[in-house]
């Protein structure tokens, strides 16, 4: 036999052995069907849910469990839930596999010998998968920290849910500039598909955006804070002595590299970092074991952390951090705080701005509706009504707009822009900000801050 033939035979033998090694053993394979009775306990979003059960595999690692749930009939999401059945408090959904591609009745979740975890409709159409076929997967596991993993024979992760966050970060989970770098909100409690709010990590910082018009607008976050490419939601113990922790700290930690620029914490409408040791942001300090916590970008654009308080007898989930908090009187900075439209002062929606002035606010308050929001048609003029002492939610993050410029030039830009619903003008600094979205208008004690709203 020639040397070439020997080499080819040897390569084929090695490949054959590799394929055998890469297979999931029969006792670790599973195929489960979305069918049967719904669970009886209260869950977030008022969702109906079904347990996933297999003789070969456990889908529960306390307090985390993988299930199917729906908020609309016959549209199921494969999701991870946190909470215990004996608790009276609502159990929470903290990871979705197929939020934009729900499945129907009798859908299947399967892990075959090739190591690919597949969610498919009853007719076989694949709706979601891990794309891990023939990559050495030998098993499936839900870890005690809520990370769902597919691992190889050495325990190394081939795929993990921590690399694919949706709207939530669990303790120890990260966003990465060179990976999945954002959280995206749900559309609503009843609609789990991608919503208009996002929190994005880039080389400049961690920034919150709202996009309802095709133009992303910044409304929160830490846009000038250097996280060095990775930000991790963490909970650490603070010790008063060598043995007993006195408190637990909720943190946003940057990548573990030396020296960081503390960033520009200019008058942002948010909670400011409590200290900045090595670039770490201290969100809050709690006096109980907050190891089971999560950070959630809500469907309303809010950013909140919740911590599980095991000693409580009722309502064991506690809101342990809020970016738009009542404590810092920053609720008015949330674009959706007053619904579609409203005038907000000190955490209260006090008025509904109209061409007739500031009227009483209700959840029916809305900006003027018209199809002619620009002066592109010959002879067409655009009308505005004026609100004195008001600020747009994005103003603090864009240095109040562009300028210096005159109020007439600012108006002319909004006149010509069909997407512009109004403009905000800083008379003292001669700054101009065009607004394609209005939402919650924030009272400004400075009467030289004026809004002009189209109608």
From Swiss-Prot:
**Where is the PAN domain positioned along the sequence?**
374-455
Residues carrying S-nitrosocysteine: 374
State the GO CC annotations.
apoplast; Golgi apparatus; mitochondrion; plant-type cell wall; plasma membrane; plasmodesma; secretory vesicle
Q: Which residues are glycosylated?
A: 56, 106, 191, 211, 241, 289, 446
Please name the Gene3D superfamilies in this protein's record: Bulb-type lectin domain
Tagged with keyword Transferase: no
Q: Name one GO molecular function term.
A: carbohydrate binding
Localization terms from the record: Secreted; Secreted, Cell wall
Query: What residue range is the signal peptide?
Result: 1-22
> Would you say which domain of life the source belongs to?
Eukaryota
Keywords per UniProt = Cell wall, Disulfide bond, Glycoprotein, Lectin, S-nitrosylation, Secreted, Signal
Q: Could you tell me which residue ranges the Bulb-type lectin domain spans?
A: 44-163
Q: What is its main location?
A: secreted
Q: Which PROSITE patterns match?
A: BULB_LECTIN
Name the cystine pairs.
Answer: 410-432, 414-420
Do the record's keywords include Signal? yes
This protein's name: EP1-like glycoprotein 2
Name its species: Arabidopsis thaliana
């Amino acid at each position: 036999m020639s040397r070439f033939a020997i080499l080819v035979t040897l390569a084929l033998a090695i490949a054959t052995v590799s394929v055998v090694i890469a297979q999931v053993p029969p006792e670790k394979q599973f195929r489960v069907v979305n069918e049967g009775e719904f669970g009886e306990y209260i869950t977030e979003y008022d969702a109906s849910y079904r347990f996933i059960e297999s003789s070969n595999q456990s889908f529960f690692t306390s307090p985390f469990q993988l299930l199917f749930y729906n908020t609309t009939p016959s549209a199921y999401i494969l999701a991870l839930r946190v909470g215990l059945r004996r608790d009276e408090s609502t159990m929470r959904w903290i990871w979705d596999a197929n939020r934009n591609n729900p499945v129907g009745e009798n859908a299947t979740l399967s892990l075959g010998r090739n190591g690919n975890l597949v969610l498919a409709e009853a007719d076989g159409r694949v709706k979601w998968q891990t794309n891990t076929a023939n990559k050495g997967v030998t098993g499936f596991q839900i870890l005690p920290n809520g990370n769902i993993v597919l691992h190889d024979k050495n325990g190394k992760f081939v795929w993990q849910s921590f690399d694919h966050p949706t709207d939530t970060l669990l303790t120890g989970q990260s966003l990465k500039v060179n990976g999945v770098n954002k959280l995206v909100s749900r559309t609503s409690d009843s609609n789990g598909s991608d919503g208009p709010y996002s929190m994005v990590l880039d080389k400049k910082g961690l920034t919150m955006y709202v996009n309802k018009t095709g133009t992303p607008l910044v409304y929160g976050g830490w846009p000038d804070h250097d996280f060095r490419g990775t930000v991790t939601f963490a909970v650490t113990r603070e010790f008063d002595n060598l043995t007993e922790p006195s408190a637990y700290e909720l943190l946003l930690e940057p990548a573990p590299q030396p020296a960081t620029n503390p960033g520009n914490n200019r008058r942002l409408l948010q909670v400011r970092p409590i200290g900045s040791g090595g670039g770490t942001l201290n969100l809050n300090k709690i006096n109980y074991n907050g190891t089971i916590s999560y950070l959630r970008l809500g469907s309303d654009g809010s950013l909140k952390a919740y911590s599980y308080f095991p000693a409580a007898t009722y309502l064991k989930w506690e809101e342990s951090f809020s970016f738009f908090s009542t404590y810092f009187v920053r609720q008015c900075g949330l674009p959706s705080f007053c619904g579609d439209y409203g005038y907000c002062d000190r955490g209260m929606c006090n008025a509904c701005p109209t061409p007739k002035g500031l009227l009483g606010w209700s959840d029916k308050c809305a900006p003027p509706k018209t199809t002619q929001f620009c002066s592109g048609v010959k002879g067409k003029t655009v009308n505005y009504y004026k609100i004195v002492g008001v600020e747009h939610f994005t103003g603090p993050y864009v240095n109040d707009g562009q300028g210096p410029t005159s109020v007439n030039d600012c108006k002319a830009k909004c006149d010509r822009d069909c997407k512009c619903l109004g403009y905000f003008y800083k008379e003292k600094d001669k700054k101009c900000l065009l607004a394609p979205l209005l939402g919650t208008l924030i009272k400004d004690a400075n009467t030289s801050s004026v809004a002009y709203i189209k109608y």
